[in-house]
Regions:
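Non-heme iron-sulfur electron-transfer modules
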Residues: 2-3, 42-57, 84-116, 134-163, ...
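Intrinsically disordered, low-complexity terminal tails and inter-domain linkers enriched
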Residues: 4-52, 484
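Short, intrinsically disordered, charge-biased short linear motifs at domain edges
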Residues: 56-68, 107-110, 114-118, 225, ...
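Cysteine-centered iron-sulfur cluster-binding motifs in ferredoxin-type domains/subunits
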Residues: 65-84, 115-135, 370, 400
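Residue-level recognition of specific faces of alpha-helices
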Residues: 70, 97, 117-120, 233, ...
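N-terminal glycine-rich anion-binding loops that anchor highly charged ligand groups
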Residues: 75-79, 89-94, 262-266
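Short His/Asp/Glu-rich catalytic/ion-coordination signatures at enzyme active sites or charged loops
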Residues: 106, 126, 130, 281
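Iron-sulfur cluster-binding electron-transfer modules in prokaryotic oxidoreductases
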Residues: 137-491
Length: 491
């Protein structure tokens, strides 16, 4: 498809507002003094008098011009982009952001507006699925975010909140320490008082509302033997949020794998995979987590590493790219990444041996973006759920649109995340399903909060929990479903 001709394209007209008329007067630009040292201004400040303005990107992994050139500005991405759907702004579309990246490579300085458009991208990769030209927007936005995080002077409040998030969520030990206080807080009713009095800042209010009711801890054994003949020896990522907020999902995952003939190794030394850090542009931090996780599985001697969290699986499959410049780790990272499998992906490769008992349920399956778009895994979860006797799968309208979770997006950009969550909740309820199934803890947290805002109740479960209930012959109430068919029928 030929590039647009004639009048100035919409994305170029809109870019004028994002880059301003004069680089020297750019609000919020990063200045460089005569000696070449970075002079980061605070928020919307201007460079020091006499300073020259630095280009938006430096030489450390900027977005690649070759990848930018793949975009022909055709607009096929627009109907699938969540932020474009919300606001209809060209610069809040993949095409517009790619144009801004190109301006940055040409030497335009980074500024408040440019950073805002990059920050508002969810990184959902729906555009990657939709693009007929094969534009690797995932690599482009990842490289851009790394530049923003290293070079852009965020406000003190923003830095403090992001610092809190990344001092907590990637560390399962710290999250475990909070389990007791959080459970006490939830049982005491203090949350209702705080929410009613609106004492918490906006972002902390969002974090508090996303917290699930914490179940009892259910640590996975370091080695779970296969039931019957061993078909494979697999490693299992226990994760951070999954391990602490959804321990029952990890327990179900290990049981399902064992029932299907897998010996499951879950090394105790494993920690965060680095997904949250990577998706937020914290490249060095993500690389450190990746090295430690690879090392934790070194002695496990596994055929595959199974992941039950979409964002984690997406990041781990990209370890070869993340550590490509590290001669000591590049080959190890690529070999490790080649072994990573989503749970449904591995089960489809193996084929079932465990008997499935009936579950008379209408199940709506929600595609997590980092599974459906980033890993292109859409058929396998449906195949696994559809093989359960009694299960009727119901598709969700706008399945390709993100629910608004997107790593830490719903914490740092709560307003658009809430709009997207409300939109997804309406589509979910319209299916009339008895149960929502998905494959990502962030989606479960986001959708539970979105339904709660509507005063609606729809039981939710991870795909692993649904499979586990069927294999063990449990009743539907084990999944929180009291009366199948109680939700309004599909319209």
């Amino acid at each position: 498809m030929a590039e647009q001709q004639g009048p100035e394209p919409a994305h170029e007209r809109a870019a004028a507002g994002a880059v301003g008329a004069s680089p020297a007067g750019m609000p919020g630009a990063v200045g460089v003094d005569a000696g070449g040292a970075d002079q980061a201004t605070e928020g919307a400040g201007r460079p020091e008098p006499g300073a020259r303005v630095a280009p938006a990107f430096d030489d450390r992994h900027p977005p690649e011009q070759e990848l930018l050139d793949d975009c022909v500005h055709c607009g096929f991405c627009l109907p699938t982009c969540p932020t474009y759907l919300l606001w209809g702004e060209e610069m809040d579309s993949p095409r517009g952001r790619i144009y801004l990246m190109g301006l940055g490579l040409e030497g335009e300085p980074m500024n408040d507006e440019m950073v805002r458009h990059f920050d508002q991208c969810l990184g959902c990769m729906a555009c990657v699925t939709a693009c007929p030209s094969g534009v690797q927007y995932d690599k482009l936005i990842e490289a851009t975010r790394q530049q923003v995080e290293r070079r852009w002077p965020r406000s003190r409040r923003d830095r403090a909140f992001r610092g809190l998030v990344f001092a907590l969520f990637p560390y399962p030990g710290r999250l475990r320490w909070l389990r007791g206080p959080v459970r006490l807080y939830q049982r005491s009713g203090a949350g209702r008082l705080l929410r009613g009095a609106r004492l918490l800042p906006r972002r902390l209010r969002t974090m508090e509302r996303l917290l699930p009711d914490l179940p009892p801890a259910a640590p996975v054994a370091e080695l779970t033997p296969a039931a019957g003949a061993r078909r494979a020896r697999v490693g299992m990522l226990t994760g951070c949020v999954q391990r602490v907020f959804f321990p029952q999902v990890n327990a179900a995952t290990a049981r399902v794998l064992a029932a299907e003939g897998c010996e499951v190794a879950a090394p105790r030394r494993q920690g965060c995979c680095g997904a949250l850090s990577l998706h937020a542009g914290r490249e060095a931090e993500a690389a450190g987590f990746a090295r430690r996780l690879i090392a934790a599985f070194d002695d496990a001697a596994v055929d595959a590493v199974v992941v039950n969290a979409a964002g984690c699986g997406s990041a781990m499959k990209g370890y070869g790219h993340l550590l490509r410049d590290d001669p000591a780790w590049a080959a190890r990272a690529a070999a490790f990444a080649a072994k990573v499998r989503d749970l449904s992906e591995l089960l489809s490769e193996l084929g079932p041996v465990a008997e499935r008992h009936p579950l008379p349920l209408a199940v709506a399956y929600h595609d997590a973006c980092h599974l459906g778009h980033a890993q292109q895994i859409t058929a396998q979860p449906r195949e696994q759920l559809g093989a359960i006797p009694g299960v009727e799968l119901r598709e969700i309208e706008e399945a390709e649109i993100c629910c608004g979770s997107a790593g830490i997006y719903n914490l740092v950009e709560p307003e658009p995340a809430q709009e997207l969550g409300d939109r997804k909740a309406a589509k979910l309820l319209a299916t009339g399903a008895d149960l929502l199934a998905t494959a990502n803890p962030g989606c479960l947290l986001q959708l539970r909060a979105s339904l709660a805002r509507r005063g609606a109740r729809l039981p939710m479960a991870h795909v692993a929990e649904v499979l586990d209930a069927s294999i063990r012959g449990l009743a539907v109430d084990a999944l929180g479903v009291e009366r199948p068919g109680a939700v309004a029928p599909r319209r």
